[in-house]
A protein has these predicted regions:
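Regulatory and interdomain segments flanking nucleotide-handling catalytic cores
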Residues: 1-349
Length: 349
């Protein structure tokens, strides 16, 4: 490409927001009327994306929060409102009586900051041969991204929450704001075990998800609200809360698959005894792992990037990722299908 005026910065055109806001509001109202209202979840998710479209680049407040978008402010406010409402259903007397503000009683911690972090990403992505390297790399990278987003979504749904409660999700890591209720705590405990078991059965320890949480409350008043973490006597700020949870989640790497191992220890067939089929077995041509009998998939010549082979045996999950890598070249959209008839929540890998 030749260097010309087109690659250098140009003069910024200033826009009068006072002129644009009324037009944005009219467009927002027009699209709001089209939102589906037959299903509550469909309405919430549609409203979420509509607000994201129209309010992401509007400041939450031109004086107090000019750097924060109105969309993030609305989303975070909605998440906290949901946490307080759900917690109050279980603990009706959580709030004190005040003429100006509603203080949270000292013995209550209604909000849970929850973190999930996928471990083993680099090893997992690059543990491949050159037989189908390009499609495998692309497919595996995208698969890890989908896995993190799917786990976050499953935790939200198991907890009776929505995308509004998701603070952040990127790079194989996510943070959620959840109500600290018995229902949510039981749902998370149950889901953690199901997920751990599913990941072990699918990847034999190559990928794991570290999860932890911190329950907290607020002390309102003064210039800023202060955060009180359950089990601590001193108040803190958001940055410290975030770091403490990050450190707790990282520490979970030392306890990977602990529940699976304990189940194995107490079961009839312990995990660390001799296993497998023995004899001549097939090995995945891409990852090099052993493949159990009747679980072999084949990739065709179109997906084989080096060598003269017409067909190669691979593990089932490797075949999925190669297919995913190929589909990324030819598809523009990702569509999520939700089955509302399913009761409870099973971890899907």
């Amino acid at each position: 490409m030749a260097i010309g005026d087109s690659v250098f910065p140009t003069e910024v055109v200033k826009v009068d927001n006072k002129v644009i806001y009324p037009d944005l509001w009219k467009e927002f109202e027009r699209e709001f009327e089209k939102l589906p209202d037959a299903n509550a979840n469909a309405f919430i998710y549609s409203l979420y994306h509509l607000l994201k479209k129209y309010t992401s680049f509007i400041p939450a407040s031109t004086q107090d929060f000019p750097e924060s978008s109105l969309f993030e402010h609305l989303k975070t406010t909605g998440a906290f409102a949901h946490c307080f409402a759900a917690y109050k259903e279980e603990f009706p007397n959580v709030f004190g009586n005040d003429n100006r503000i509603r203080n949270i009683k000292s013995s209550h911690f209604p909000v849970k900051l929850f973190c999930g972090d996928i471990s083993g990403i680099q090893t997992f992505i690059y543990n491949i041969t050159n037989k189908a390297a390009a499609k495998s790399l692309k497919g595996r990278s995208f698969y890890v991204q989908l896995l993190a987003e799917s786990i976050a979504q499953e935790v939200l749904e198991a907890s009776g929450c929505t995308l509004i409660n998701q603070v952040y999700a990127a790079g194989g890591k996510f943070y959620l704001l959840l109500p600290n209720t018995t229902l949510v705590n039981n749902a998370i405990t149950d889901y953690k075990y199901k997920l751990e078991k599913a990941l072990w059965e699918e990847f034999n320890g190559q990928l794991s998800v570290n999860m932890d949480e911190i329950n907290f409350s607020f002390i309102l008043g003064g210039e800023r609200s202060r955060i009180l973490i359950n089990g601590e006597s001193d108040t803190t700020d958001v940055g410290t809360l975030w770091k403490k949870l990050s450190d707790k989640t990282s520490a979970q790497k030392r306890r990977r698959f602990a529940d699976v191992f304990m189940d194995s220890y107490n079961s009839i067939k312990p995990l660390f005894e001799a296993g497998g089929t023995g004899g001549e077995i097939q090995v995945c041509a891409v990852s090099g792992i052993e493949i159990e009998k009747n679980k072999t998939k084949n990739i065709k010549k179109d997906d084989i990037e080096q060598g003269e082979e017409v067909e190669l045996p691979v593990a089932a999950y490797v075949k999925k990722q190669i297919d995913l890598g190929r589909d990324l070249y030819t598809h523009k959209y990702l569509v999520e299908l939700v089955n509302d008839s399913v009761k409870g929540y099973e971890a899907g890998v």
